């Protein structure tokens, strides 16, 4: 599914109240200053897409090739460039320098949000995979946080790939699907998305229309 999306910054979490008094936990996303830097077409690039810049970056931190690319579009450098595959009809409605705002979405719409999860560093199997710990007492000595056996015998004589073991936890790309847009603050260019999304405060996220809306609650 080819749809235009937005690049945003995770501001944090709060809650809002419905007219009936129900409390809804929401994540606030700043989606200001999404500006088009390039329109790709089948004729020039072999496919149709739009490239969007988000945030700001000092000119001294921009490479010369990128500076030339942005100057051609007539936009200032951003922290991040993101490409969205779209159809030709939608691409024809956009132009270099155009600003894509929060009004791209509507209240109640289902969206997919992609971000980088918070890094936890090196973690054991209890924290990483919710393994059970060893017994605290009753003869157990220095085996409280061990994963247990990781293999079998001389046959097969190896540890199978994918075996859940200790290692780095977090700091991976995570996509949460079918989140609902609870409120849109067009004046402050904010999206309030129901529920939690990956990443720490200040992290960059990508918001796109949901691709698996059938049967979504």
Swiss-Prot record:
N5-methylglutamine PTM positions: 154
Molecular function GO labels: rRNA binding; structural constituent of ribosome
Organism: Burkholderia vietnamiensis (strain G4 / LMG 22486)
Post-translational modification: Methylated by PrmB.
TM helices/strands, residue ranges: none
The organism's place on the tree of life at top rank: Bacteria
General function of this protein: One of the primary rRNA binding proteins, it binds directly near the 3'-end of the 23S rRNA, where it nucleates assembly of the 50S subunit.
Disulfide bonding pattern of the chain: none
Alphabetical keyword list: Methylation, Ribonucleoprotein, Ribosomal protein, RNA-binding, rRNA-binding
Gene3D superfamilies in UniProt: 3.30.160.810, Translation factors
One of the protein's GO biological processes: translation
InterPro entries in alphabetical order: Ribosomal_uL3, Ribosomal_uL3_bac/org-type, Ribosomal_uL3_CS, Transl_B-barrel_sf
Assembly and oligomerization: Part of the 50S ribosomal subunit. Forms a cluster with proteins L14 and L19.
Protein name: Large ribosomal subunit protein uL3
Pfam families: Ribosomal_L3 (PF00297)
Cellular component terms per the entry's GO annotation: cytosolic large ribosomal subunit
Coiled-coil zones: none
Entry similarity comment: Belongs to the universal ribosomal protein uL3 family.
């Amino acid at each position: 599914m080819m749809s235009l999306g937005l690049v945003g910054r995770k501001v944090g979490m709060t809650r809002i109240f419905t007219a009936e008094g129900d409390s809804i936990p929401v994540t606030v996303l700043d989606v200001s200053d999404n500006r088009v830097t390039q329109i790709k077409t089948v004729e020039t690039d072999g496919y149709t897409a739009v490239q969007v810049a988000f945030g700001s970056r000092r000119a001294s931190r921009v490479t010369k090739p990128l500076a030339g690319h942005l100057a051609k579009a007539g936009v200032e450098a951003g922290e991040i460039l993101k490409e969205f595959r779209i159809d030709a009809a939608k691409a024809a409605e956009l132009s270099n320098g155009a600003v894509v705002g929060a009004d791209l979405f509507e209240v109640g719409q289902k969206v997919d949000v992609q971000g980088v999860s918070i890094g936890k560093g090196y973690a054991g199997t209890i924290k990483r995979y919710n393994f059970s710990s060893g017994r605290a007492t009753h003869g157990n000595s220095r085996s409280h946080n061990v994963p247990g056996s990781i293999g079998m015998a001389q046959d097969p004589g190896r540890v199978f790939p994918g075996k859940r073991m200790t290692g780095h936890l977090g700091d991976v790309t995570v996509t949460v699907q079918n989140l609902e847009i609870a409120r849109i603050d067009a004046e402050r260019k904010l999206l309030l998305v129901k529920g939690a999304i990956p990443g720490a405060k200040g992290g960059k996220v990508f918001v796109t229309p949901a691709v698996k809306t059938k049967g979504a609650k």
